[in-house]
Each structure stands twice: as structure tokens, then as C-alpha cells.
Amino acid sequence: MDIAHDLQVIAAQEHALVFPQFDPDRAWQVGAYLHEVAKARGIPAAIDVRTFGQPLFFSLLDGATPDNVDWARRKGNTVAHFRRSSYAIGLKMQQAGSTLADKHGLPNTEYASHGGAFPLTVAGAGVIGSITVSGLPQRADHELVVEALCAHLGHDYSKLALAKA
């Protein structure tokens, strides 16, 4: 895995995957889509769609655990703090040989620099929340969210996907 290349692709994902507008109905649509995809693939995931401070969609699939719920919360907190995907932040920490606690003073009990939370961005408003999946390895969590956003925003997922690890 080439971290620098992945960071470039993630930056392109974050730039492209922007909603023209967003409301609770759209949150439900995206969340329900993620739920159905995860269910069809047998993924035991927690799915969380929220604006900062307001949950809009939450779902647990069969086999998901309280740890998945906590990971989703901490990944979402990372997006809220940095306004970037949790995977991008984790890769930057890996590249720097550091951690969120060491570099930014952010406790591991509240923040996670693992993939799976993606910024919920609205044109003209910026990052207003996060869309999070927890249940797979971090790269796969991240890509599942990207796949769902591509489906909802009319982008070709194959053009925005990370290279196979």
C-alpha cells in the first residue's frame, strides 16, 4: 500500500463526494442503502449518519457489537475535529509515525484514526457531519462509505476507489 497515493485518492474522494443539499430524508436514504449493502454482503456493521451534534440515521446489523458502536462514535469524532475522513487522518498519522494522542492531544477514548468515517460535505456549506461504517477492516469500512456516496451522488465508484490492497 502506497500511503502517499492513497492520501491523494482520498483527497479526490473528499473533493468529489459533495451533496448539493442534505436533509434528514437524504440521511435516511444513504443510511438505508448502506444497511442493505452490508446486509446483502453479510457485514456485521454499525452505520451512523449524522450532522455534528445530531444523529440522523443509525443501524446495527446482525453480529455487530458494542465495540462497533464505539468505533463509529470515535471515528465520527475524528471527522468532526479534522473535517477529513478518519482514514486520511490515520494514514497521515502512520506516515508521521505518530498518533492522535501524541500529535494533537486527542484521547483514544474519544477519537479513532481508523478508516470508516467520511465527511458529509454540502456545496456552499462545507463539512456538516459524517457518514460512518464500523465492522470491517478500516480500509474496507472507508471504501464501503465511498461506494455508497458514489451511488447516491452519481459518481463512477471505479474512478474514485482506492487500489486493492
Swiss-Prot record:
Superkingdom to which the source organism belongs: Bacteria
InterPro entries: PduO/GlcC-like, PduO/GlcC-like_sf, YBR137W-like
Signal peptide: none
One family name in Pfam for this protein: HbpS-like
PANTHER family: PTHR28255, UPF0303 PROTEIN YBR137W (PTHR28255:SF1)
Family: Belongs to the UPF0303 family.
Full protein name: UPF0303 protein Bxeno_A1932
Originating organism: Paraburkholderia xenovorans (strain LB400)
